[in-house]
Amino acid sequence: EQCGRQAGGALCPGGLCCSQFGWCGSTADYCTVPGCQSQCSGSGPAPGPGGLTNLISRETFNQMLLHRNDGACPARGFYTYDAFIAAARSFPAFATTGDQATRKREIAAFLAQTSHETTGGAGWAAPDGPYAWGYCYNRELNPPSSYCASDPNYPCAPGKQYFGRGPMQLSWNYNYGQCGRAIGVDLLNNPDLLSSDPTISFKSAFWFWMTPQSPKPSCHNVIIGAWSPSSSDRAAGRATGYGVITNIINGGLECGKGWNAQVEDRIGFYKRYCDILGVSYGNNLDCYNQSPFGNGVSVDSM
């Protein structure tokens, strides 16, 4: 096997599709979803990020992440449009699958979920409202531990800590190891790259977004409509929509417990970004009545 869950989440080179069996190719056998695991499209590798720059310009990016470079934000100056676009080149299916509304909705959903993970504004005056303060942080504040777990495949490097870093706040040595293997960077020995190199930092978030972790689908497949809930998903209240993405990311802490401020914050960012991009929200935005997925990579276990 060359890619996907059979190869630690590795991506195929050159934008090739990863089949359900973990092999790289460009024909329908490899690229047809839902069997395809990553870099999927209906007829071979998806186009590169030229389409992405047409959907979200530098000006729009700056409007969406309005206060990321504010003096109150510890990560000011770190997250750039150029790094976002450069990182997307390693994940050519991102925001290139489906019609224009679907592609815009994926951009909104990705930036919304990562904005929640990196949000500022709490505890100080937040001009323009709380949903204009995404991407304020690039590393976890006051981590409670080194996030080092015993793992024969991805052992902790001496003296290194694996607390939350980057847009998706990737945590734990086994997640750094899988991600690093997929993007071709030794993150086990160099975890600080996620808070010092903005392109690698964005790549870590795209890796999480595009990679399914059984029994969870990828966030990408959910937002483009390639995931169909099984009978057990339906019994658990999980239906296609933005709410399932929240479940994938942090369902253990936020889903199936009724209304809570964390889920509302994720929805608030999403609605603001959809409005800026001029696209509808879709259905099933929350996960209040969804049971969490089983074990798998998620921010709450990261």
UniProtKB/Swiss-Prot annotation:
A Pfam family cross-referenced in the UniProt record is Chitin_bind_1
Keywords linked to the UniProt accession:
Carbohydrate metabolism, Chitin degradation, Chitin-binding, Disulfide bond, Glycosidase, Hydrolase, Plant defense, Polysaccharide degradation
Organism of this sequence: Gossypium hirsutum (Upland cotton)
Function comment: Defense against chitin-containing fungal pathogens.
Q: Does the keyword Hydrolase apply?
A: yes
| GO molecular function list | chitin binding; chitinase activity; endochitinase activity
Q: Which reaction does it catalyse?
A: Random endo-hydrolysis of N-acetyl-beta-D-glucosaminide (1->4)-beta-linkages in chitin and chitodextrins
Family note: Belongs to the glycosyl hydrolase 19 family. Chitinase class I subfamily.
Q: Where are the active-site residues found?
A: E117
Q: Supply the InterPro entries for this chain.
A: Chitin-bd_1, Chitin-binding_1_CS, Endochitinase-like_sf, Glyco_hydro_19, Glyco_hydro_19_cat, Lysozyme-like_dom_sf
- Entry EC no(s): 3.2.1.14
Q: What is this protein called?
A: Endochitinase 2
Reply yes or no: does the keyword Disulfide bond apply.
Answer: yes
In this entry the propeptide is located at 296-302
Q: List the disulfide bonds.
A: C3-C18, C12-C24, C17-C31, C36-C40, C73-C136, C148-C156, C255-C287
What SMART domains does its record include? ChtBD1
In this chain the Chitin-binding type-1 domain maps to 1-42
| Any single GO BP term | defense response to fungus
